[in-house]
Amino acid sequence: MFASRILRNSAQTLKTELPHKETIKMAYDLHKPRSTAIRHLNENPEEPILFLHGIFGSKKSYATDSKLIASSTHTPVYTMDLRNHGETGHAQPFNYETLAQDVKEFCDEHKLDKVKLIGYSLGAKVSMLTALQFPNLVKSAVIIDNAPIPQPQIQLFMKQYIKSMLHVLNESKIRADDKDWKNKASAAMKRFLPNGVIRKNLLVNLVNKPPKDFESPVIDFEDGYIHFLNPIEQMEEMAVKDVTDWPVETTKDLKFEGPVKFIKGLQSPFITDEGMKAIQTHFPNNDFTDVNSNHDILDQRPSEYVKIITDFFNKQRYQSAPDDTILGNKTPTPKQTEVSA
């Protein structure tokens, strides 16, 4: 067990355990396609896209990319905050079974069916488990740089992320009314995380005031200091243990037969030989595209990964839809373009 730290002092910060909730309502943004220049090209609302972020990300992390994907595929894209992220409530547990169930409940609540999933890192594992456990809900998926196996080798990364964020909360004492609060927080994290892209992504959830009507059972947003929207103290062990884990026993006999595109960073440690074997076992209808990147594919290769996704989803749509539902006349099926940087 990790030692519990008290944020600043007990009078300033609430100190309780996270409440236990089997499911939780997820905050979301809906990105609709821009009107197309092709007058008769229909949107595809029956097969919406759900974009699930990585650890300590949010629905706002790749909003611009989601808008591009929505317009390029003529399909609405939902970006959601997973529990303990962004504007979604704080609760335990934080294991993959619970996160996948949250996605299922979101789809039920919004009457979504035959969804197409995009998952990055943490969101990739959530997407894979959602497809395996609820195959009738999911039509296809794009999995960005992760595999359905336990990954103890990445625990060190998680510990560094947590250490840097706790340093901002416990040691830096940055006031919420400081005009330079975000830059000061980034500078404080630099000693633990020299990579500016990683710091930028972690700072997405750092605020000097909470979103409207947002409340947390464990964070006192009125104490005059900046805060992460993540309950960092309570997530310390969960982020290291649960995020790097995978429910091996409950998924050992599960397969998802739908098409799945895997995007792999050539310099990333996340998809090992063991991970490749697990992918072949659980997702037999898989297709891989390698990109010249480490795990930070979405930041290092933004145009490439967006094109891979849109080509993949558009190929499925044109192959499965009758010609007269696409353009009102016969339209040749476009060739898929693989992008590898």
UniProtKB/Swiss-Prot annotation:
Gene Ontology CC entries for this record: mitochondrion
AB hydrolase-1 domain: residues covered: 48-301
Main subcellular location of this protein, as a coarse class: mitochondrion
Keyword terms of this UniProt record: Hydrolase, Mitochondrion, Transferase, Transit peptide
Subcellular location: Mitochondrion
Transit peptide location: 1-40
Active site: S121, D145, H295
InterPro entries from the UniProt entry: AB_hydrolase_1, AB_hydrolase_fold
UniProt EC number: 2.3.1.-
GO molecular function, one term: transferase activity
Pfam families, sorted: Abhydrolase_1
Reported function: Probable alcohol acetyltransferase that uses acetyl-CoA to synthesize acetate esters from various alcohols. Not involved in the synthesis of ethyl acetate.
Family in the record: Belongs to the AB hydrolase superfamily.
Name of the protein this chain belongs to: Probable alcohol acetyltransferase
Organism: Wickerhamomyces anomalus (strain ATCC 58044 / CBS 1984 / NCYC 433 / NRRL Y-366-8) (Yeast)
Gene from which this protein is expressed: EAT2
